[in-house]
């Protein structure tokens, strides 16, 4: 796990966990994850799940996406989604509040790959540069994404060629995130 993205993601995950501890909540909690199996689940009460990010061993891959659309994904995209299991993590990047998307389990990884593949197929059809989403904001038509060509992290308007560069790469984006604690 010495790739800069894996290190930055692990560092942010540690900050996220510490933010939850500092507010007296212990582990992050979610009602949305109840009943889902994952190696990062600490406890499932039936009403809410407590979880913590854990290193994924062995590291996953996104070969299904690459094969499905016949494209080589940027290494940062692969490392972002394949080095740990975690629930989504709330964060702020400057004034932008977002949920950093994560892979919760192997089954969730399959679903994620299907969603990424659909996103890339739509972009190809619309003749847009390929991106892969890594975060969602409180807007139905915008996502935080990684440009597959440059590795830049961008704020992208879905279905349009409107993109604002947020960071030159994923590691520097992750290093600028501030954890946000949202109670379930």
Curated annotation (Swiss-Prot):
Disulfide bonds: none annotated. The keyword Cell inner membrane applies. Keywords: Cell inner membrane, Cell membrane, Membrane. Gene3D superfamilies: Syd protein (3.40.1580.20). InterPro entries: Syd, Syd_sf. The keyword Cell membrane applies. CDD domains: Syd (cd16323). It is found in: Cell inner membrane. It is a peripheral membrane protein. Signal peptide: none annotated. One of its GO terms (cellular component) is cytoplasmic side of plasma membrane. Pfam families: Syd. It comes from the Bacteria. Coiled coil: none annotated. Interacts with the SecY protein in vivo. May bind preferentially to an uncomplexed state of SecY, thus functioning either as a chelating agent for excess SecY in the cell or as a regulatory factor that negatively controls the translocase function. Belongs to the Syd family. This is Protein Syd. The gene is syd.
């Amino acid at each position: 796990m010495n790739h800069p993205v894996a290190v930055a993601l692990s560092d942010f995950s540690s900050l996220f966990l510490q933010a939850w501890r500092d507010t007296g909540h212990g582990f992050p909690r979610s009602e949305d994850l109840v009943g889902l199996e994952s190696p990062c689940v600490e406890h499932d009460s039936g009403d809410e799940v407590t979880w913590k990010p854990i290193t994924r061993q062995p590291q996953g891959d996104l070969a299904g996406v690459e094969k499905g659309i016949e494209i080589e994904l940027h290494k940062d995209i692969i490392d972002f989604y394949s080095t740990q299991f975690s629930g989504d993590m709330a964060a702020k990047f400057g004034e932008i509040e977002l949920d950093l998307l994560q892979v919760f389990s192997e089954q969730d990884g399959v679903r994620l790959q299907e969603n990424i593949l659909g996103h890339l197929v739509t972009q190809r059809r619309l003749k847009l540069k390929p991106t892969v989403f890594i975060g969602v904001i409180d807007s139905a038509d915008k996502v935080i994404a990684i440009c597959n060509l440059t590795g830049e992290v961008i704020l992208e308007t879905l279905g349009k060629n409107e993109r604002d560069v947020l960071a030159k790469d994923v590691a520097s984006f992750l290093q600028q995130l501030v954890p946000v604690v949202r109670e379930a």
